[in-house]
Amino acid sequence: MKYRIAFLLLFLNSFCSVVLSQDDDVDIDEWQVMKVEAAKDPFANGSQFTINFANYTKEEWCYPLPGAKVNSPFGGARHHSGTDLKTFGGDTIRAAFPGEVILSGPYYAYGYCVILRHANGLETLYSHQSRNLVKVGQWLHAGDPVGLEGQTGRATGIHLHFETRVNGRAFDSARIFDHENHALIRQIFVVTKQKNGTLKFTAEQVE
């Protein structure tokens, strides 16, 4: 009987390991508002602002983890707050847009984490890094190194947990990045603050 129990426990442990390996974040299941320096309100002049990504040059943006594949997308049943990007491990993570470092260091379940605040009204977050390569207050150009892909915090595999945010609230990065082709989507991106405080994201495609 004890051998059957031992076999069952071994099977369950193996099964759980397989399930976790398919979705590397075991922690960041809800949209989280992080305590960082207050941002200039992008809605200070009205309930809407736009970003014309169609006019961005190659110097103004960079895919955050070149060569990566999506291991776990945004949202889903557990409300995953970011997009998990994965390479073979240890690769350099890069700034998606020009911006200022407003957080750099260990941050609870995120592990070694960096947040950049961009002039276009967005923030980007990079977490589970093995090492941060930037300091708070530093200004980065698009493509500058942010850190090294890792497994710090509560994560079961080496990867980058990447978030795009407005006013500290996460939205799907696939709205602005074509993850399959590692490209910025050429569009006029519109963010509207609704009367109940929620944010609505729409896009006008540009030929």
Regions found by a protein language model. Give the residues of each.
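Zn2+-dependent peptidoglycan hydrolase active-site motif and core
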Residues: H80, A95-L133, H159
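Conserved, short, structured surface segments that act as functional micro-motifs
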Residues: V114-H118, Q138-K195
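Polar/charged, compositionally biased leader and regulatory segments
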Residues: K2-R4, L8, N13-G76, N181-E207
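A structural signal for short beta-strand/turn segments enriched in small hydrophobics and glycine
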Residues: V70, I93, G99-V101, G137-E149
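Short, glycine/small-residue-enriched coil/turn segments at secondary-structure junctions
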Residues: Y56-C62, G75-P106
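Residue-level recognition of beta-strand microenvironments
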Residues: P73, S104-G105, N132, E149-T152
